[in-house]
């Protein structure tokens, strides 16, 4: 590892520990030339994943877009900021494990819906309403029916 001060490539590791919930290794190093101490992080390199959009175009997977969409769905629910981050990390891990290089945006959307359905029903309905482009109350009712198995009469009395 190159020293940030003198650019010497000889250093010794003073301390190593797991970081980022086991996803990286933090190493404290000392330059053998100038004795400058610095920290490095070692992570597994992941292959970039391309997302194939509905119109056929592709773009690189963007974790921030995933976070933004899920955060909006989880506003004013019991999801904490930390829980949202962990949820997004889990979705990202599944995407990176399941796909070789390309994944359809529809597959990502369904993966998010499947996971949200288990975690929080309100966030699930909110995400589904945007992802599936609900046009009116009927779309909400049919999704609520599938979520709870309730009859239309029961839902009508609630609404």
Curated annotation (Swiss-Prot):
Zinc finger annotations (unnamed) as residue ranges: 3-34
PROSITE patterns for this protein: ATP_CONE
This protein's UniProt keywords: ATP-binding, DNA-binding, Metal-binding, Nucleotide-binding, Repressor, Transcription, Transcription regulation, Zinc, Zinc-finger
Cofactor binding description: Binds 1 zinc ion.
Coiled coil: none
Signal peptide: none
Region (Disordered) residue spans: 1-21
Pfam assignment, any one: Zn_ribbon_NrdR
Polar residues bias locations: 1-11
Cofactor(s) named in the record: Zn(2+)
InterPro entries assigned: ATP-cone_dom, NrdR-like_N, RNR_NrdR-like
Domain ATP-cone, residue spans: 49-139
Keyword Transcription regulation: yes
GO biological process, one term: negative regulation of DNA-templated transcription
Gene Ontology molecular function terms on file: ATP binding; DNA binding; zinc ion binding
NCBIfam families: transcriptional regulator NrdR
Family label: Belongs to the NrdR family.
Function summary: Negatively regulates transcription of bacterial ribonucleotide reductase nrd genes and operons by binding to NrdR-boxes.
Protein name as it appears in the record: Transcriptional repressor NrdR
Species of origin: Prochlorococcus marinus (strain MIT 9312)
Gene that encodes it: nrdR
């Amino acid at each position: 590892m190159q020293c940030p001060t003198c650019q010497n490539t000889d250093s010794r590791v003073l301390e190593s520990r797991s970081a980022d919930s086991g996803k990286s290794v933090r190493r404290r190093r000392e330059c053998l030339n100038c004795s400058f101490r610095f920290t490095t992080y070692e992570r597994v390199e992941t292959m970039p994943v391309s997302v194939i959009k509905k119109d056929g175009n592709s773009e690189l997977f963007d974790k921030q877009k995933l976070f933004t969409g899920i955060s909006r769905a989880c506003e004013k629910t019991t999801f904490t900021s930390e829980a949202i981050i962990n949820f997004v990390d889990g979705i990202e891990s599944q995407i990176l494990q399941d796909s070789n290089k390309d994944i359809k945006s529809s597959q990502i959307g369904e993966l998010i819906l499947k996971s949200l359905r288990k975690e929080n029903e309100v966030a699930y309905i909110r995400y589904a309403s945007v992802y599936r482009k609900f046009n009116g109350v009927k779309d909400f009712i049919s999704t609520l029916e599938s979520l709870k198995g309730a009859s239309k009469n029961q839902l009508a009395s609630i609404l």
